[in-house]
Amino acid sequence: MKLTMREIVKEDIDLIVQCENEYFHNFTTKNKVEDDLSNPLIHYYILVKEVVLGYINLWIDEDKAQINSLVILLEQRKKDYGSKLLEFTINKLNEIGIRDLTLEVRPSNTAALKLYEKEGFKQVSVRKNYYNNGEDAFLMYKRLGSD
């Protein structure tokens, strides 16, 4: 079966909540994700190959987008699905005319940093004490489309 990316549906919400709370230690609720789905600026996409492999959460506003979270389920990691999901997402954003893509990432998340750098993101600044535990965040940027 081939890899596909689709928008989330209500049946995916419990998995999103579980992952956000498990991987990011966020206090995310089902109601919060349902509210996100009704917000026209927030988009979730799921990567599927027979089963859900991971997802990405984005804010999209005019010609700018921000990645809020990118998750590959633990049992699906180290299979290049993070790259595939990011590539699918960048292609989708290019199709709809997004020019600027940003994200924040923990300096300690070396796997994510490696992925983002491989996909052409550049670190543009540091947000001091950004996370609840006092860890900084690297702000990363990628220009999309052609100039």
Where are these regions (language model features)?
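C-terminal "cap" of GNAT-fold acetyltransferases
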Residues: 99, 106-110, 129-147
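Beta-hairpin "wing" of winged helix-turn-helix
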Residues: 125-126
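Conserved active-site tyrosine of GNAT-family acetyltransferases
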Residues: 116-117, 121, 140
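Acetyl-CoA-dependent GNAT
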Residues: 3-75, 86-88, 92, 96, ...
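Conserved acetyl-CoA-binding loop-helix of GNAT-fold acetyltransferases
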Residues: 72, 78-91, 110, 114-118
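Short coil/turn segments at alpha/beta junctions that flank glycine-rich nucleotide-binding fingerprints
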Residues: 79, 96-99
